[in-house]
Amino acid sequence: MSAATPLIVQQAEAEQLLARIDVLQAMRQLFLDLAAGQALQPAQQLVEFPAGRGDFINYLGVLAQEQVYGVKTSPYIVREQGPLVTAWTLLMSMQTGQPLLLCDAARLTTARTAATTAVAVDALAPAEACRLALIGSGPVAHAHLQYVKGLRDWQGVRVHSPCLDERRLQSLRAIDPRAEAAGSLEEALDEADVILLCTSSARAVIDPRQLKRPALVTSISTNAPRAHEVPAESLAAMDVYCDYRHTTPGSAGEMLIAAEQHGWSPEAIRGDLAELLSAQAPRPEYRRPAFFRSIGLGLEDVALANALYRLRQAG
């Protein structure tokens, strides 16, 4: 069989199509498929460039119901003017073995990361949660606010970021008028029920053990080696959840460090999203902080690329 030419979708078109996709529902469905054995999530592949010049991570996934599999490859290229990070997703047919789609996945990555956090917030946050803290003000923070704004009756949304200026604040307020700048990190965290860490930091941003009251803290990944937004030693003092228990502990920086240096075990993870959405894991009781860690799954990339492909094919 001759090789098929895949659809090639550049960033501008990907953004246009993304606006027409229910990303939150796509993420919920993939974790339900994972729980039902209709999806497969291999571990991430980290490949380091020689001489410390960067790395690339491959995110793999299989959606049996949709008869597709795929890989997103994302390099972290060290440069004098700062690191360069890109991402492209290749979607393949399980029926023909031919490529279906090659897509610039930069914005898709941001969307699926935020939507996955939102799925976790909906599953883990107390029903009465009303105070939201957003740590970060870049595109990832904007996307997080977009997907969580309707999940609870937020009475206040406090934002803290060293880069938060009036332009960024107004941009966040365009998403949710309740967003307001906090004068300090401490002010943003004060009495918060849900804390969304949306930074590109490779080192701890907050210590959940110092919160005045138990809260749900969510954390994402960046490509930096062993990146983490909370101290590794804090895991033992929290109810820990993750996107997928079979892969996250092998990639999340604080989990790796906690296991190596602080006696923490991945067996302490109370549940992942597949287990939570299929009622196979307990919810937190909030006698202490709850922590949700996502590393970004290939399944998320494949599900979103597949939704984009189907939409593109439908015209």
Swiss-Prot record:
Induction, as annotated: Induced by growth on D-arginine and D-lysine. Repressed by DauR. ArgR could be a transcriptional activator of the dauBAR operon in response to the presence of L-Arg.
InterPro entries: NAD(P)-bd_dom_sf (IPR036291), ODC_Mu_crystall (IPR003462), ODC_N (IPR023401)
Example GO molecular function: oxidoreductase activity, acting on the CH-NH2 group of donors, NAD or NADP as acceptor
GO cellular component, one term: cytoplasm
Keyword terms of this UniProt record: NAD, NADP, Oxidoreductase
EC number of this enzyme: 1.4.1.25
The keyword Calcium is assigned to this record: no
A Pfam entry, by short name: OCD_Mu_crystall
SUPFAM superfamilies xref list: NAD(P)-binding Rossmann-fold domains
GO biological process assignments: arginine catabolic process; arginine metabolic process
Family matches, as PANTHER family: KETIMINE REDUCTASE MU-CRYSTALLIN
Family stated for the protein in its record: Belongs to the ornithine cyclodeaminase/mu-crystallin family.
Protein name: NAD(P)H-dependent anabolic L-arginine dehydrogenase DauB
Organism: Pseudomonas aeruginosa (strain ATCC 15692 / DSM 22644 / CIP 104116 / JCM 14847 / LMG 12228 / 1C / PRS 101 / PAO1)
